[in-house]
């Protein structure tokens, strides 16, 4: 048994060495006086700060559990002078974000549903583009401990070997980094570099001065890290930019992000830019999402919430807005926690907040799909109404849409396929064939043969193309007085006669009219 000044949990492989000793926090049992590394006990920082007396596992059997501090309206908090200096009197306690308590107390937990069919999360072993097109992904998809061969995803090295030191070494210590202050939900100014972030991340949880988060390090051009990482097959098959980008300028860099979050990190409710779908694989640590589906009611409430001048002070889940004559709050919400090795797919438009229970490293990315084009445009309009800064929107979104129109105008069969309509035809044909073999379908005359052939659902095609054409027509009108909008139109590809090109798209749309 080690002496009381040595942590007994990691005695075989000591946590601290000469370079980390001063950065590690300790807890002492008030009964036996044994010292422990706080991180070895895996007690979240927020709980450590609330302890009056710690009892180790052995002593708690005879002396009862640890004793929390007495709660009082006059209890002291760690004053967040940075937030106060910025004029934010809401975030006064810098040990955790003010919304974390409500997040953690949210009761509906998708991980705890025992029903055969989970109403919140689609738990699977694999996911393909065909499955996505068939189901329209009405629920997020979680593949626990995903088999990389099955989902056809490749990590640069084993997930458990992807550490903050590995990332800093591969990407480079001097790489500029956007760091978010969790308490204020604002970027840290002046910015950091990756070397400084690595040192902060490696600091013991209890010794960190503030909670900070990194969620926007794009790594697709990093040689041995990003370039050797292969996104899941479903993402590569459905990514709209992959299909349509036919441009000399660099494509939007949103495909591969490295997210580095410390314990207690919290990102308030948001929708990913332009309603992009998201893939998310956890290398280490864990993440908890609180999610709401993109129903018309929820999106309407979300838009109003974003427009509130005191939005940062308001918990989205409690926000009330009149919808169709009734006072409504967001509905259909649930929590889900991801563990190392999990692959998570968030469909287009989902409203979500994210909490980090323990230090975590994640690789993920965003992608547009033809299937979700109407939702992408719906969220794009919400971003305009709520005045989301250009920095936080999908880069070159309008150029992508012009290129999308050109690609599918010249590849109309692919338009059917990418909407899942060719599968619809094959499925209908198969059903009719099976029924015919059972004698349930009479032989048709030659006159009716063509009429009875299975046809694609034109309403799906029409709705998708209609919202695209409408958006491009509106964008073209804006381009007449807005140089930035004008420069996003790929005239070198579609020609300088933009009205003529739009007329061709309109004719195609008219052909699809149900």
UniProtKB/Swiss-Prot annotation:
It catalyses: N(6),N(6)-dimethyl-L-lysyl(36)-[histone H3] + 2 2-oxoglutarate + 2 O2 = L-lysyl(36)-[histone H3] + 2 formaldehyde + 2 succinate + 2 CO2. The keyword Zinc applies. Fe cation binds at residues 270, 272, 352. One of its GO terms (cellular component) is nucleus. It comes from the Eukaryota. Residues 220-384 form the JmjC domain. Its EC number is 1.14.11.27. It is found in: Nucleus. It holds the Pfam family Cupin_8. Keywords: Chromatin regulator, Dioxygenase, Iron, Metal-binding, Nucleus, Oxidoreductase, Transcription, Transcription regulation, Zinc, Zinc-finger. The JmjC domain mediates the demethylation activity. This is JmjC domain-containing histone demethylation protein 1. The gene is JHD1.
């Amino acid at each position: 048994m080690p002496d009381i000044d040595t942590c007994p949990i990691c005695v075989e492989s000591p946590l601290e060495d000469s370079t980390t000793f001063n950065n590690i926090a300790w807890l002492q049992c008030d009964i036996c006086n044994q010292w422990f590394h706080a991180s070895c006990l895996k007690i979240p920082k927020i709980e450590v700060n609330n302890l009056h007396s710690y009892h180790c596992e052995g002593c708690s059997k005879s002396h009862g559990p640890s004793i929390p501090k007495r709660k009082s309206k006059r209890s002291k908090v760690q004053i967040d002078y940075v937030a106060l200096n910025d004029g934010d009197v809401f975030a006064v306690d810098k040990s955790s974000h003010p919304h974390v308590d409500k997040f953690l107390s949210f009761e509906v937990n998708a991980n705890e549903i025992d029903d055969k069919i989970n109403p919140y999360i689609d738990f699977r072993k694999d996911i393909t583009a065909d499955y996505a097109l068939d189901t329209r992904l009405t629920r997020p998809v979680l593949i626990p401990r995903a088999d990389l061969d099955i989902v056809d995803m490749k990590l640069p090295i084993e997930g458990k070997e992807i550490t903050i030191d590995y990332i800093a070494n591969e990407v480079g210590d001097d790489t500029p980094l956007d760091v978010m202050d969790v308490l204020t939900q604002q970027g840290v100014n002046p910015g950091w570099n990756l070397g400084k972030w690595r040192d902060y991340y490696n600091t013991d949880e209890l010794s960190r001065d503030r909670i900070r988060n990194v969620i926007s390090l794009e790594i697709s051009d990093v040689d041995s890290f990003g370039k050797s990482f292969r996104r899941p097959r479903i993402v590569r098959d459905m990514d709209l930019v992959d299909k349509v980008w036919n441009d000399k300028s660099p494509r939007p860099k949103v495909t591969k992000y490295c997210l580095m979050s410390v314990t207690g990190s919290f990102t308030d409710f948001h929708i990913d830019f332009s309603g992009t779908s998201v893939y998310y694989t956890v290398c280490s640590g864990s993440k908890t999402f609180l999610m709401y589906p993109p129903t018309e009611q929820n999106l309407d409430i979300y838009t109003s919430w974003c427009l509130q001048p005191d939005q940062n002070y308001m918990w989205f889940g409690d926000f009330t807005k009149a919808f169709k004559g009734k006072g409504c709050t967001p509905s259909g919400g649930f929590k889900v926690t991801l563990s190392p090795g999990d692959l998570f797919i968030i469909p287009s438009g989902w409203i979500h907040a994210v909490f980090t229970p323990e230090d975590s490293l994640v690789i993920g990315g965003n992608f547009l799909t033809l299937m979700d084009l109407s939702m992408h445009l719906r969220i794009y309009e919400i971003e305009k109404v709520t005045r989301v800064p250009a920095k936080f929107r999908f880069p070159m979104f309008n150029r992508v849409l012009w290129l999308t129109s050109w690609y599918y105008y010249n590849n109309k069969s692919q338009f059917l396929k990418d909407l899942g309509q060719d599968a619809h035809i094959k499925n209908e044909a198969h059903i009719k064939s099976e029924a015919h073999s059972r004698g349930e379908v009479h032989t048709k005359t030659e006159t009716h043969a063509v009429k009875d052939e299975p046809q694609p659902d034109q309403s799906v095609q029409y709705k998708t193309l209609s919202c695209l054409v409408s958006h491009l027509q509106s964008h073209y009108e804006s381009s007449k007085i807005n140089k930035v909008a004008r420069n996003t139109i790929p005239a070198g590809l579609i020609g300088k006669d933009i009205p003529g090109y739009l007329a061709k798209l309109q004719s195609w749309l008219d052909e699809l009219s149900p």
